[in-house]
Amino acid sequence: MLRVWQERFELADALISFQDVALGYDGIPVLEGLTLDIHRGDFLALVGSNGCGKSTILKSIAGILEPLRGRIRRGAGEKPVRFGYVPQRETIEMVFPLTVFEVALMGTYGRVRAGWPISHADRELVRTCLADVGLADLRRKPFPALSGGQRQRVLIARALAADPDILLLDEPLSGIDLGAAQTIMELIARLHRDHGLTTVMVSHHLKALRERQVVREVVWVHEGKLLRGPAATMLAPDMVFRMMDADIG
């Protein structure tokens, strides 16, 4: 059964396809010659040393950063791909007194025409998304008053409110304690399992990825190249040592 499932997705057009892509800033490339396909149902983790370009790749998948050279194709047909993007928590401005519900509601803004009210259906969707991440009872609480793990779950709910084809998460385990990190990993795994949500996450928490065993494939960003394979193989201690000259225990 697993082989049939794999063959079906191998034959399908990729949702995202990098074709000899160069990425960089101010016209200066930091990554070149990238080839990467993401199919519906994939669950990938982008890993590598600090500054290797993991977040740059994630932003380019979402269309936030366009390539300097090459082509990134988004969508397997005429219908555009919808993204749910979870940035690093440090990028969220904390001075505005927004509630949990109001932050999650931002995920619907891409579907709302300027000057039009948010529909009842979208508000109900946001309530469902907050329930999915276990925060329905906190929807009226100020966002800055939450713990780090709770804030991260709100940002995931906001991404889900975009009704995405692909969920993109940039360091979702960063800056939270071990218990909260386990909760976040279990949540991401459940969303992928229950909804078939294509998921790509950036993480430097290699030990957590290996121990939780929820990511299907890992893509190492190493010396400007991409190396992709099954999670069990790519997170094995000998592979980690080769890629980072470090042991994860």
Predicted features, each with a name:
Residues 163:
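Conserved catalytic motifs of ABC-family nucleotide-binding domains
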Residues 142-146, 150:
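Conserved ABC ATPase signature
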Residues 213-230:
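H-loop (His-switch) and adjacent beta-strand-loop-beta switch element
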Residues 105, 120-138:
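Conserved ABC ATPase "signature" region
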Residues 167-171:
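Catalytic Walker B motif of ABC-type/P-loop ATPase nucleotide-binding domains
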